[in-house]
């Protein structure tokens, strides 16, 4: 149900000990911009905010391209006709589609809704990306705060589980516009794919107690993996007005005794606190593979 990442390579690296890449953004032409804070300090939890070494005035921005490949021709977005913007939703670049949806949110709602419906009706059903195009359309209708009910119902039954899961997430935020939200979530809770059921579990926590618990009960009729189990437990506790029981900490075997054991126990508690050692170095001490902390 969850995601697993595997390290392939370092996209950029430096021998400069002050190198601090803190943000990245893909430009409309496909190039990648990387913001380098470039500071002797690391992070903001290890050093005082008023540390004199904290530089507020300097930094670097790198632009990364592939020299032997042409850049993407930037799509027409700002001020473009609605018809052009809707066709942008078919482009492969995610950030282009994102910026297009942002632009459509600022247009006349009635005009966007009307032209969006016409655009959907003329999509090629044989297009391999057909369901994805429909999902983009659903996101547009959500963005203008006028969710397309027929479309959300259609996508909740899509062939691609990614699309079904995304439709459930839209349903989470637009229940005030979909009168049978609970009934639709009940169907999602029976979905064959865990990702869809996980979205249904999370969304159930937004409902009233009676409706939400029914959906949670339905979702747990199928196996819950580690990602779903935690969400299910938390949602159930929230709807029931209780707290998630704190897991008893596993007793660590050690040869230490007396003062050494007391010191070890206190150190372990500090290490495990959120925002302290454990956050970067991880419980096993092997650190986050891509964090740069050792």
Q: What spans do the regions from the language model cover?
A:
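Beta-propeller domains with acidic blade repeats across secreted/periplasmic ectodomains
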Residues: 1-85, 105
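Gly/Gly-Pro-rich "capping" loops immediately C-terminal to redox-active cysteine motifs
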Residues: 48-52, 282-294
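C-type cytochrome heme c attachment motif
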Residues: 59-60, 269-283, 293
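Amphipathic alpha-helical scaffolding segments comprising HEAT/armadillo-like alpha-solenoid repeats
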Residues: 78-86, 109-124, 145-157, 176-189, ...
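Alpha-helix N-cap/helix-start positions at coil->helix boundaries
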Residues: 94-95, 125-131, 161-162, 179, ...
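Alpha-solenoid HEAT/ARM repeat scaffold
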Residues: 98, 132-135, 165-166, 198, ...
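Structural signature of alpha-helical solenoid repeat scaffolds
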Residues: 105, 139-142, 172, 205, ...
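Electrostatic cytochrome c docking/interface patches
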Residues: 245-272
